[in-house]
Design a protein with these regions (language model features):
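Histidine/cysteine-enriched polar flanking segments
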Residues: 1-241
């Protein structure tokens, strides 16, 4: 097994081959159970955790499960996207401690953090960050909000993603970016080749020098994002499994 100090947070429902791939590359896997929210999303990492920054600078903010409620909007307070340059969420419902942590990390990294308000409260579920300014989403409202800033957005067709208990899931919830062997890798849960916009997605990543790994043993499935902590210290006490 390769040496790696990074921890990956993902649902225990993630593809077995994806989990084996991550473990074989030395990532420590951590899954959550959040009984405060409804069962279909209770294993989703992005309901309780928020990744601040990308790649080698990624750090995990651990939310307080006692602040969460079963239904929307009480279950979205941590479901934000923070690339380091941008903090994207429905700011009406963002947890104040999360926002303060994002601002503190940006200051520590000598980065100016731009906050972008979107109507979609399940922001991380709906938005897959590719780099500091590049994103993939099927949500036209998010795409419109990001277009007002220095961003590149690939707007894909909605649907074609499995999510148990719902008609379909969302692209943000299928994956996440990891640093691996000096490269930047986007990992996706399930066979993304089945998505009708797969070729556009692959080209979007290739143009940004991002490698792609996906598991073909399962359908493309929203598992509540794949989040990585590449930093040596957590921002809060870690959540127990």
């Amino acid at each position: 097994m390769l040496q790696n100090t990074s921890t990956v947070y993902l649902s225990r429902l993630a593809s077995p081959s994806l989990q084996r791939f991550l473990q074989s590359n030395g990532f420590q896997l951590n899954s959550l159970d959040v009984p405060a929210v409804y069962p279909e999303i209770s294993t989703h990492a992005d309901i309780l955790l928020c990744q601040l920054g990308l790649w080698e600078k990624a750090q995990i903010f651990h939310g307080d499960p006692e602040k969460l409620a079963r239904n929307y909007p009480g279950n979205i307070r941590y479901n934000a996207v923070c690339t380091g340059k941008y903090f994207i969420h429905n700011l009406q419902y963002t947890d104040s401690d999360l926002l303060a942590a994002a601002e503190a990390k940006a200051a520590a990294d000598s980065t100016i953090l731009t906050k972008i308000h979107v109507k979609q409260g399940y922001t991380r579920c709906s938005l897959l960050p590719v780099d500091d300014r590049s994103f993939i989403t099927s949500d036209a409202g998010i795409a419109k909000s990001l277009a007002c800033h220095d961003t590149d957005v690939l707007l894909i067709r909605p649907g074609h993603i499995h999510l148990p208990g719902f008609d379909y899931g969302f692209i943000g919830g299928t994956g996440g970016g990891l640093p691996l062997s000096g490269r930047r890798l986007l990992v996706v849960n399930g066979n993304i080749e089945t998505h009708p916009d797969y070729k556009k997605i692959a080209t979007f990543l290739e143009d940004r020098d991002i490698d792609l790994y996906y598991s073909k043993d399962r359908p493309l499935m929203d598992i509540g994002s794949i989040l990585v902590d590449a930093a040596p210290k957590p921002l809060q006490q870690p959540v127990r499994d």
